[in-house]
Amino acid sequence: MNNFDDILEQPAEQEAPAQENPKRKLEWWQIKEQKQRKEAYATLDRIFHEFSEGKGDVQGYLDTHGRFDRYSARNALLIHEKCPNAKQIGNYKYWESQGVDILKTEKNNPIIILEPGNTYRRKDGTTGQNYYAKEVYDISQTTAQGQEQPKVALDERLLLKALIYKSPAAIHVVEQLPDGRRGALYQPEQNSIFVEKGMDAADIFRCVSQELAKAQLMAVNPEQLPAECGNKAFCVSYMLCKKYGIDTR
């Protein structure tokens, strides 16, 4: 057993647009926000259409979402569309608090994301969520450009332990997977993930993260088959690898 196998053997709807009162005269900033919000939704509609036709930059989006995993998928799409190489974003007040200024040439070129606002009652009695447009800027649009945050070296054992913490399926290390498979395999009938013995940390992270994603997706929707959530699981694994510096090869 190598230095990593023992770790694995441990118990282990588009929202409705914000409702405006047509009788109320809007201020200039409200008109601006309304325009930005409509443009953001139009951008998302275009991106979704491109994805549906197999023309969108899916890998680029996943790269961006891997860096901004705390943002919604929708906002990650908007960030990627406007600034695909974005590393660190914040609104005007955030950068001001950091002692950083927005470049004059970039002040009128913000990244627009959608933030939740007030809820409202629909005609059918259900509750809806309003969203408003928010201006943010990447560090490359500020006087702090080029001052990237240093990368933190992560301990491989701790990273693997974090990956399998509260796993939705039992994990077992085996000498060989069935049918000559390599890496890892989720078996829903046994609710177990079987992992090939002897892999290095990067290989373990890549294959186990994908099978963990399958297990979690099937826990949410038990009716689907492992093959039906394969693409989603791959995307989850890819983003995790990008986030933690694991080669996605």
Model-derived features with residue positions:
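N-terminal accessory/interface modules of nucleic-acid-binding and processing proteins
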Residues: 1-249
